[in-house]
Amino acid sequence: MRTLTLCWLALLALAVTGVLLGGAGDSPWLLAAVLACAVAKGWLIGERFMELAHAPALWRRLLLAWPLLMALAVGAALYLARMNN
């Protein structure tokens, strides 16, 4: 139970950090930090709350690949939108 509490606190800290960074300005580095927070939250949820830490390596890699791909897609879309303005 202690591990889940620590994970919950980490998720809370990552969520607050993402919100604060998202409202701090409009810089590519801030965007990267917000997306990194989102990927870290996805990893924590998969590894601890969904208990995939003991799952086969393929499932763990696929679960981490999804938030990474989504973060890359969002980052690329925002980069392209910035280039067009």
Curated annotation (Swiss-Prot):
Coiled-coil ranges from the UniProt annotation: none
Broad class of the protein's primary localization: membrane
Residues spanning the membrane: 4-24, 27-47, 61-81
Cell compartments where the protein resides: Cell membrane
Record key words, sorted: Cell membrane, Membrane, Transmembrane, Transmembrane helix
Pfam families, alphabetized: COX4_pro
Record-linked InterPro entries: Cyt_c_oxidase_su4_prok
Membrane topology per record: Multi-pass membrane protein
Any one Gene Ontology cellular component term annotated for this protein: plasma membrane
Protein name: Uncharacterized protein PA0522
